[in-house]
UniProtKB/Swiss-Prot annotation:
Primary role: Located on the platform of the 30S subunit, it bridges several disparate RNA helices of the 16S rRNA. Forms part of the Shine-Dalgarno cleft in the 70S ribosome.
Protein name: Small ribosomal subunit protein uS11
PROSITE patterns: RIBOSOMAL_S11
Keywords: Ribonucleoprotein, Ribosomal protein, RNA-binding, rRNA-binding
A GO term from the CC aspect: ribonucleoprotein complex
Quaternary structure and interacting proteins, as annotated: Part of the 30S ribosomal subunit. Interacts with proteins S7 and S18. Binds to IF-3.
Superkingdom, taxonomy of origin: Bacteria
Organism taxonomic ancestry: Bacteria, Pseudomonadati, Bacteroidota, Flavobacteriia, Flavobacteriales
Length: 133
């Protein structure tokens, strides 16, 4: 016997996020990609983007230009939703950190603070071996 399809299981209700004029921008810049998330004060994501979402692949994802396009994309959506000021939290050693912050500022959102929250070990785990090119 075939099971009947449950119509309620198919549709997912899109959750509404309360957008305030002040928020936070989280820039995560790894060696392989860059991810920008704009959130409200509670931490609910208003808009996000990444270099991979913008169509960059491989080594092109970790470039300042890719970070700039990703930051412009996310901040445009957040600006239309009503966000005007952000604190920027930067994490990671990647290339596009500064260009992402500049792109957020140039898209009409005022940057009030820049905070670096890159995790640094107090000599914890052994790092991967060095590349020899």
């Amino acid at each position: 016997m075939a099971k009947k399809a449950n119509p309620k299981a198919k549709t997912q209700k899109k959750r509404k996020v309360v957008v305030e004029s002040n928020g936070e921008a989280h820039v995560t810049a790894s060696f392989n990609n860059i991810i920008i998330s704009l959130t409200n004060k509670k931490g609910d994501v208003v808009a996000w983007s990444s270099a991979g979402k913008m169509g960059f692949r491989g080594s092109k994802k970790n470039t300042p230009y890719a970070a700039q396009l990703a930051a412009e994309d996310a901040s445009k959506v957040a600006h239309e939703a009503g966000m005007r000021k952000v604190k920027v939290y930067v994490k990671g050693p990647g290339n596009g950190r500064e260009s992402a912050i500049r792109a957020v500022h140039n898209s009409g959102i005022e940057v009030t603070e820049i905070i670096d929250i890159t995790p640094l070990p107090h000599n914890g785990c052994r790092p991967p071996k060095r590349r020899r090119v």
